[in-house]
Amino acid sequence: MTGREEATDEKPKVKLYPSFGIDKSRLNGSGFRSKGFAITDLLGLESELQPHQSGPGAGPNGEGQSAAVGGFSFPGGSLPLGLGFLCSLAAQQPPGAPCFLPSHIPLLQSRTESHFMQNLEQQRDVYSDDDCLSGDRNDGKNSGNSQKRKKRRHRTVFTSHQLEELEKAFNEAHYPDVYAREMLAMKTELPEDRIQVWFQNRRAKWRKREKCWGRSSVMAEYGLYGAMVRHSIPLPESIINSAKSGMMGSCAPWLLGEPAGMHKKSMEIVKKAPGTPESTHSDTYSEEHKGKDSDTTWSSGANGADDSEDMAIDLSSTSKQENKSTLKRSPPRTENSSDSENES
């Protein structure tokens, strides 16, 4: 072999490395970008195939053309096994095709179609499973909503007769027993559980009403307004106006109640006292009597000191006389006792 043939042997080795690596013509600012995933795009044969076909150096025979595809030259004008078949198929491809499609190869076409059909079936299975799951969830939600709607009860509308009977029973006892509830159920023609719920709501309403005014009826009874009423002091106008306007639920019934309220009784007593002449006469008589009593007590208090001194002196003299009398009486008692001893 000559030196020229050795040089030709070395040329394909140098030119084959960039073809299987990164194609410099396809590099840009963003990096490596390929037009497709065909074999010609991966090997970089498409960009060099078109100028070779249109160039004047194309040989008359097909072997020379296939041997010089893409500017590559092989020893003896022959291609390796497999590469010649791919290059011949690439040479038969029309020049305007953007990429090498697998449909041009009859052996790969059946494989790609079968693979594509398998992917479609898998996607359909996935979508069908998702649809089933979503459908099951929707069915579960609908069933849960239907159960919630079934559990909801309708509000019981009480008649005036039923409310009257229930209020009477509540005034008698806030916590009726089973027997009382059954009797109410017979009178009102209501179920026993409905009556129990009504009493629970009525007790809550009663507690709320009791706590509205003064925070508690007991506290209000011993509070400021209760003391004012007990001492006949007029209440504020806001409290009285609230009772007159019909807001009896906002105040304690014992304070401003119409039948027997403390405020009403105290106001009646105050009105009667200044109007009757007997009361005025009795008041003046009591005042005069009190003045006389005070004068007599003052004078008696002044004379009381002298009387106490005289009484002290008299008491001392009487005590001395009593001591003397006891001393005089004691000797004969002793004699009598001695005589009794001798006789014994």
UniProtKB/Swiss-Prot annotation:
Primary localization: nucleus
GO biological process, one term: regulation of DNA-templated transcription
UniProt GO cellular component terms: nucleus
Disordered: annotated span: 49-70, 127-156, 273-344
Tissue specificity of this protein: Highly expressed in the central and outer tiers of the inner nuclear layer of the retina.
GO molecular function: chromatin binding; DNA-binding transcription factor activity, RNA polymerase II-specific; transcription cis-regulatory region binding
Subcellular location(s) of the protein: Nucleus
Keyword annotations of the record: Developmental protein, DNA-binding, Homeobox, Nucleus, Sensory transduction, Transcription, Transcription regulation, Vision
Keyword flag Lyase: no
Superkingdom of origin: Eukaryota
InterPro entries associated with the record: CVC, HD, Homeobox_CS, Homeobox_domain, Homeodomain-like_sf
Gene3D superfamilies, per database record: Homeodomain-like
Compositionally biased tracts (Basic residues): 147-156
Region feature (Octapeptide motif): 37-44
CVC domain boundaries: 211-268
DNA-binding region: 151-210
Comp. bias regions, Basic and acidic residues: 280-295
Pfam families named in the record: Homeodomain
Positions of short motif Nuclear localization signal: 147-151
This protein's domain notes: The NLS interacts with UBE2I.
Similarity comment text for this entry: Belongs to the paired homeobox family.
Function description: May be involved in maintenance as well as cellular differentiation of retinal interneurons, such as bipolar cells. May play a role in establishing interneuronal cell classes in nonsensory as well as sensory systems.
PANTHER family, A to Z: CEH-10 HOMEODOMAIN-CONTAINING HOMOLOG, VISUAL SYSTEM HOMEOBOX 1
Subunit structure: Interacts with UBE2I.
Annotated protein name in UniProt: Visual system homeobox 1
